[in-house]
Amino acid sequence: MAVDHAADTPGSPVGRLAHERVDHRFKGLPPDAEGRTVGELAAERRSLFTGGFTTPVLALSAEALEHNLAVMERYSTAHGLAFAPHGKTSLAPQLFERQLAHGAWGITAAVPGHVRMYRAFGIQRIFLANEVVDAAALRWLARELDADPGFRFIAYVDSPRGVELMDAALREAGARRPLDVVVELGAGPGARTGARTEADCAAVADAVAATGTLRLVGVAGYEGEVPKPDGERVRAWLRRLTALAVAFDGESRFADADEIVVSAGGSAWFDAVADVFAELPELSGPVLKLLRSGAYVSHDDGHYRHITPFNRVPDEGALHPAFRLWAQVVSRPEPGQAFLNAGKRDAAYDLDLPEPQVIRSPDGTERPATGLTVTGLSDQHAWLAVEEGTSLEVGDWVALGLSHPCTSFDKWQLIPLAEADGTVTDYIRTFF
């Protein structure tokens, strides 16, 4: 399901990222690269280990990244799903371009600020998996939609009050194109956003129908918020979602829609989404079954390693962790204690602490980081417990596996993309 998008060419918004100058803003990059453009530095194909990079430095595996992109393209295609990966994970336009090149329908956003960034980099299809009731943001969206007939935008609605605020802002803006919305079905009591009952959803749909500024095109939600989730509970909620789509269609609520959107899917239950969406009966119009997983692009060595649906369906693929945070041993004050120069400012820690994986000595030899455990993080230090007999010296580099892609990307503005031997071939720019 490939779509037209801004090519990564020198004159495109993404291509112009290569013209940005390397300087003090980008931690970990070689000090002697100051003043070079990102493209010039990439062309030098420096070694991550001997090319002057300073620690800590986060690197993305080129091989793992490409593997993950291909895996989810195959998976979504095999299950007849359109794919709008959640861009909040990386906020990296270069990765958006690669996701689109691998067949993505568009990119999912979480807040209006994301949408503005996506548009600055030429994204033509955006699914905002959230409510938007900010008048200033809605005025901007109205201008953007009116100025570009090819721009497709969809947002959640979950309350008549939200619909009222959207309608007022869009009327004030003089919007000429209706803004497409999907009714969000909440995942259950105590869950996040979303109308809680089918009756609540119908009331929201009625409110949309009463406006001239909004167009109801489908239903959506996030199964990851199902309370005490397991396969049975998640599938039961997903069947509520598809039943809502069938009911709304039977009531001709999608009469103005070019296609009917049914959307769900984080990174923990996309197998359940695929199963239940496959059961959806034929509706009155074409159906866009839209999956929105995001963490897959880098995967991880912690939380998502344990919860990925590919653990349940290994014959359909496997994701590879793409992140490695390299830090240096700066202190060994006690026999069982060492400190690395990477901390909360550098590594995700909201779900799990980093996992030591490899020790690299100054002479370039590498060995497994057996006997090392990260026990805590300070702002700029990792606390390492060192088992007796473990060889670890001040000056050694330690590779850390990370847990939770969303809070790994956000700590780095420019991330080296490295091949297996450490050759850096590109730099991924993020916009957090």
Predicted regions and their residues:
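A charged N-terminal "starter" segment
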Residues: 1-143, 428-432
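Active-site loop/helix belt of alpha/beta enzymes
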Residues: 171, 186-311
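Active-site-proximal beta-alpha core segment in soluble small-molecule metabolic enzymes
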Residues: 84-228
